[in-house]
């Protein structure tokens, strides 16, 4: 870093005596760490309460794997009466995208996973352990970096990029492990006076951690999910404060999770190899380390092989995809819990009406290997979730989605009274309709109930078994002129269709037709299909009686007439 970045006041003639003086030279105006230790006291929580966080970087869209981690973290915290907070890790500001923080906050809101603490908008936050944006915690990190320098556990590094490239080239030529460590750490053994002289001369520098580790030694670590794992010790002198004065991820993680009193760090297993470094940082800073739980990634079947869901290849990798498709947030969360704990599926079967919040989630029972993403199963869960909603709920969710993604559907739903009748078909029964898996299905599944949509798109009537046009026309004529009465109850309605079938030479019972197929043209089910197709242009719909009750006499009469005209 340039001294100007830190507002360093250099007294060129001051004699540097020890590490504390060097620390003061580099960070003269930062507070002592005791100030922050007092400012962020232990949380007043019940015994056993877990404090977790979701700590994404605003460098792109929110990945479904990120939402998965957030759901697990939130579930564990809620179960124990703990705290789930949102921290934005925005120290890599070159990669930050516009509205990145807003996208993160909105994704959690969309899935009803708003944090107890942390960022609640691009600029606003709640909680007593902030700031919750790392870019606003610069002085905090510098205070702890100063502490390490004063202890001889960190040092300024003046190596240029050219020098670092040269080190790497020599390591590659010698076929040895690359990195800034041991004899390759050129600035590690500079004396305090040498470092001070370079600083006074205005040489740019960064701050590195002085690792006490040796690669030939092993550490044993118990991960909450992965179990016992052995690693070589970290011996890399990693950068902890960059040239711009901001911390690296590793250093910020240790400082933040200490001051915010995170008890469990739940994150992707791509960070598993960083555990030795992170534990080392916690130890050298004098912090109690949190427990780590490394989640396996969500996988995809790719031509018989497994690979991670890719931001580049797979649209379903983005959380925004589920919103655009209109997959209910509750369905997505339920599906993710399904792959998180193998016991969830049986629990759901035994408790079909309970909230997912009542499931006894076990972090240590998560799979150590990545689960395959199954869109079919997710949509099936979506059908179940929507089937349990009231007509009013389905209407409201459909309208909210349509206003953003389907202008035609939004216009169609303007008549709320009629829409509620449509959505009420086969809803509230013991076996409610399950034809809608996501809000983008709504137009297809109810469009035929609206005349403009029906007449605008009907181009054929798939009558199936009965193909004789004269018979079809006569069925339609007789039904509207002789048998239809909108005040009939369901049994009377169906009995009349049976009478119509018999009058036309069809079996009034399916079993009669099967017993003597030669005696009948077909059976009552086929006659019902003619009416269904004439009224909806579909062979498969929810309950036909309920559909006709909603359509009403005038619509029915007109549709049967149009269907008859279509036969000519």
Question: Where do the PLM segments sit?
Answer:
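N-terminal Rossmann-like or analogous alpha/beta NTP/dinucleotide-binding catalytic cores
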Residues: 2-173, 273-287, 331
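Short amphipathic alpha-helical segments and their helix-coil junctions
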Residues: 49-53, 85, 315, 355-363, ...
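Glycine- and acidic
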Residues: 52-59, 85-90, 259-265, 316-318, ...
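Residue-level signal for inorganic ion chemistry
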Residues: 73, 104, 148, 152, ...
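A generic secondary-structure signal for well-formed alpha-helical elements
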Residues: 108-115, 149-156, 168-171, 175-178, ...
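Active-site cores that bind ATP or allylic diphosphates and position pyrophosphate for catalysis
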Residues: 155-294, 299-309, 318, 476-487, ...
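Catalytic adenosine-cofactor/nucleotide-binding cores of aminoacyl-tRNA synthetases and other
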Residues: 285-466, 536-568
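Helix-rich, typically C-terminal accessory recognition domains appended to large enzymatic cores
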Residues: 495-504, 508-551, 555
């Amino acid at each position: 870093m340039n001294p100007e970045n830190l507002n360093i006041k250099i007294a060129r003639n001051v004699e540097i005596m020890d590490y504390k003086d060097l620390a003061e030279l580099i960070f003269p105006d930062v507070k002592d760490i005791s100030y922050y230790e007092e400012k962020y006291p232990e949380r007043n929580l019940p015994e056993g309460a877990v404090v977790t966080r979701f700590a994404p970087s605003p460098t792109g869209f929110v990945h479904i794997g990120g939402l998965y981690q957030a759901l697990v973290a939130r579930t564990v915290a809620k179960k124990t009466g703990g705290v789930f907070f949102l921290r934005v890790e925005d120290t890599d500001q070159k990669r930050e995208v516009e509205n990145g923080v807003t996208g993160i906050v909105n994704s959690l809101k969309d899935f009803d996973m708003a944090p107890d603490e942390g960022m609640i908008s691009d600029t606003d936050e709640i909680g007593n352990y902030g700031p919750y944006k790392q870019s606003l915690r610069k002085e905090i990190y510098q205070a702890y970096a100063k502490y390490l320098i004063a202890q001889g556990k960190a040092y300024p590094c003046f190596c240029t990029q050219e020098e670092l490239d040269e080190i790497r080239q020599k390591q590659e030529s010698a076929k040895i492990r690359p990195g800034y460590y041991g004899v390759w750490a050129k600035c590690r053994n500079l004396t305090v006076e040498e470092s001070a002289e370079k600083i006074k001369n205005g040489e740019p520098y960064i701050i590195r951690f002085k690792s006490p580790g040796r690669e030939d030694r092993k550490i044993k670590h118990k991960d909450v999910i992965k179990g016992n794992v052995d690693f070589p010790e970290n011996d890399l002198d990693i950068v902890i404060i960059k040239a711009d004065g901001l911390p690296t991820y590793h250093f910020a993680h240790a400082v933040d999770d200490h001051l915010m009193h995170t008890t469990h760090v739940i994150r992707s297993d791509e960070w598993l190899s960083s555990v030795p470094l992170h534990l080392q940082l916690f130890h050298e800073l004098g912090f109690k380390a949190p427990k780590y739980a490394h989640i396996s990634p969500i996988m995809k079947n790719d031509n018989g092989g497994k690979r991670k869901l890719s931001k580049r290849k797979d649209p379903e990798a983005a959380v925004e995809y589920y919103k655009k498709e209109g997959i209910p947030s509750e369905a997505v969360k339920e599906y993710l819990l399904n792959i998180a704990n193998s016991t969830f599926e049986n629990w759901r079967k035994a408790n079909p009406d309970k909230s997912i919040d009542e499931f006894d989630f076990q972090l240590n029972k998560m799979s150590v290997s990545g689960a395959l993403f199954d869109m079919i199963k997710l949509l099936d869960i979506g059908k179940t979730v929507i089937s349990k909603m009231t007509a009013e709920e389905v209407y409201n969710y459909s309208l909210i989605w349509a206003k953003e993604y389907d202008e035609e559907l939004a216009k169609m739903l303007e008549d709320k009274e009629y829409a509620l009748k449509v959505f009420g078909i086969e809803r509230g029964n013991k076996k409610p309709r399950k034809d809608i898996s996501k809000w983008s299905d709504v137009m297809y599944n109810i469009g035929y109930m609206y005349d403009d949509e029906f007449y605008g798109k009907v181009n054929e009537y798939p009558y199936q078994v009965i193909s004789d046009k004269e018979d079809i026309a006569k069925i339609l004529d007789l039904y509207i002129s002789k048998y239809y009465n909108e005040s009939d109850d369901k049994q009377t309605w169906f009995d009349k269709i049976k009478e119509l079938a018999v009058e036309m030479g069809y079996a009034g019972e399916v079993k009669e037709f099967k017993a003597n197929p030669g005696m009948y043209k077909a059976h009552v089910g086929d006659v019902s299909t003619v009416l269904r197709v004439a009224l909806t242009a579909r062979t498969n719909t929810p309950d036909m009686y309920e559909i006709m009750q909603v359509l009403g006499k005038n619509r029915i009469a007109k549709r049967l007439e149009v269907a008859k005209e279509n036969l000519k």
